[in-house]
Design a protein with these regions (language model features):
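Basic/aromatic recognition patch in beta-strand/loop cores that engages polyanionic ligands
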Residues: 49-79
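Short proline/glycine- and basic residue-enriched helix-capping loop/turn segments at helix->loop/beta transitions
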Residues: 45
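Residue-level signal for pocket-adjacent positions within structured domains
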Residues: 48-52, 90-93
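Enriched for short, Lys/Arg-rich terminal
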Residues: 67-98
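Residue-level signal for beta-strand positions within conserved beta-sheet cores that form or flank
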Residues: 1, 60-61, 81-84
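Arg/Lys-rich, positively charged N-terminal/basic patches that mediate binding to nucleic acids
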Residues: 1-34
Length: 98
């Protein structure tokens, strides 16, 4: 059964900032990157445990996928049959709060 995908407000803001940064130089590349990121995230609705456990958090329900150059951190809410995208940030940056 597919999980429902939701986006935390912080993750939505992250996307907006990432798109703005890329689109500043190339709007088409910005749209292309966001589309490919959404495509990668969509797979989590069917395979929520496909991402690795985030080493910094060591919590089996907090996982991540890498969509270069970004880390997409998400939480599996099994009781609610839901995957919440918590944050999206450039992998070279420090860890933001969830």
């Amino acid at each position: 059964m597919a999980h429902e995908l939701t986006w935390a407000p912080a993750a939505r803001l992250d996307l907006k900032e990432i798109f703005g940064y890329i689109a500043e130089d190339d709007p088409i590349a910005g749209k292309k990157f966001i589309r490919s990121l959404f495509s990668a995230v969509e797979r989590l609705s069917v395979f929520p445990e496909s991402g690795r456990i985030v080493p910094e958090f060591k919590d089996v329900t907090t996982r991540e996928i890498i969509h270069r150059p970004c880390r997409v951190v998400y939480r599996i809410k099994a009781g609610q049959n839901q995957v919440e995208i918590a944050r999206v940030w450039h992998a070279a940056r420090g860890i933001p709060q969830l």
